[in-house]
């Protein structure tokens, strides 16, 4: 906005930090997308920095020395990983995990972790974050979006070595699905004992509402707390107003996800059920990193002949217009409840079910397993009035996410009260 950087997913926290006179240094992780690369990212960061923001890109901290060191560490890790696997009794690797017949899967995961890309990425990320903490003095807090990914463990491990006085705050910013195994370790694995073998976790693991807090608390994270759901605060306005339907013609909104295979299954089912959109509109909204155009082309589906519509507007605008939403593993399912949409969730035989509504204490959704089920359910709900549904759903959404726009919990955490 006007040459200044605004964090779309964290604007309320950004504004609160400005209000509290807490300076911000942004560290960006590059995701090559839509023609952007490291060079263009650094140029953009510099242009925004000239307007008063302090923005750094992870790629700026790469050096020949770092890459050589990372390569040596990786070779050492390969020797240890391969040697340990070769000399270890394989029954030890499967005894408490699975059966002996699953050893090929265990071997694949072992090699991927100790030899493959995950190992290389982890080492490079760790060395990069050590350079980051060396280069930026007197960091009070390090706040990041927590999804329990490997780079987060690299960040926390590097912080303990280079900047132990810095407090890391991992903010769980969307939803937590019970089948998202990266969150659900054994309790002994997440116990912090001030030992080098401790799992590198943030100093504060911040959930964004009562439901996710209770779910994560089952694992007994010792540093678990709660704050407001800054990405979803806009829903408080939606829940407080009377719903007014913005379209006279019913709309089925189909929401794609990150996984291309799952998105392809989603589109295929819609096409088999409704090869042409006649009585109601069918809109398709893709995930940013998984554009739908190429998937339609691979499936041989002509969007124009089917009378489908590809939409790119903000999800809130689309949900306000939609009558029903067809969505697999996505936070959009919860947002659709806030807008009073009928939610239809597919259960594909070759995809793990990761929809947040399935885990929550909410039952007003449809779980379908076949094209016939999907077609019948859409025809049953697409023309229904949404007012009653919306009223019934308000309390559920407010109980799932903390939607207090005044941010009292965030204020106390940022001020370390």
Which stretches of residues belong to each language-model region?
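Catalytic-core helical/loop segments in enzymes performing group transfer/polymerization on anionic/lipid-linked
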Residues: 1-417
């Amino acid at each position: 906005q006007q040459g200044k950087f605004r964090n779309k997913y964290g604007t309320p926290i950004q504004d609160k930090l400005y209000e509290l006179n807490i300076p911000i240094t942004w560290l960006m992780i590059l995701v090559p997308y839509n023609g952007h690369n490291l060079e263009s990212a650094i140029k953009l960061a510099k242009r925004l920095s000239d307007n008063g923001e302090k923005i750094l890109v992870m790629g700026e901290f790469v050096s020949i020395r770092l890459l050589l060191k990372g390569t040596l560490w990786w070779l050492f890790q390969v020797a240890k990983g391969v040697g340990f696997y070769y000399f270890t009794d394989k029954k030890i690797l499967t005894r408490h995990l699975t059966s002996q017949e699953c050893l090929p899967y265990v071997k694949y995961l072992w090699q991927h972790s100790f030899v493959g890309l995950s190992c290389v990425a982890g080492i490079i990320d760790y060395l990069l974050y050590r350079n980051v903490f060396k280069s930026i003095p007197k960091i009070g807090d390090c706040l990041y979006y927590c999804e329990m990914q490997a780079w987060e463990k690299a960040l926390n491990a590097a912080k303990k070595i280079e900047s132990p006085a810095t407090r890391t705050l991992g903010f769980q910013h969307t939803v937590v699905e019970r089948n998202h195994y990266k969150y659900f370790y054994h309790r002994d694995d997440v116990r912090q004992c001030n030992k080098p073998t401790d799992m590198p976790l943030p100093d504060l693991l911040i959930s964004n509402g009562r439901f996710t807090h209770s779910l994560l608390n089952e694992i007994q994270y010792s540093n678990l707390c709660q704050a407001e759901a800054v990405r979803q605060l806009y829903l408080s306005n939606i829940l407080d107003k009377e719903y007014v339907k913005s379209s006279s013609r019913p709309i089925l909104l189909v929401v794609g996800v990150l996984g291309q295979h799952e998105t392809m299954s989603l589109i295929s089912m819609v096409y088999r059920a409704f090869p042409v959109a006649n009585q109601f509109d069918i809109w398709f909204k893709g995930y940013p990193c998984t554009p739908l155009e190429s998937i339609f082309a691979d499936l041989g589906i002509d969007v124009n002949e089917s009378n489908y519509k590809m939409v790119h507007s903000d999800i809130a605008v689309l949900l306000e217009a939609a009558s029903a939403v067809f969505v697999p593993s996505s936070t959009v399912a919860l947002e659709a409840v806030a807008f009073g949409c009928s939610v239809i969730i597919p259960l594909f035989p070759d995809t793990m079910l990761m929809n947040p509504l399935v885990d929550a204490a909410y039952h007003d959704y449809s779980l379908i397993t076949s094209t016939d089920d999907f077609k019948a359910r859409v025809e049953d709900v697409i023309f229904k009035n949404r007012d009653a549904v919306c009223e019934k759903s308000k309390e559920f959404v407010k109980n799932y996410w903390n939607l207090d726009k005044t941010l009292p919990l965030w204020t106390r955490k940022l001020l370390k009260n």
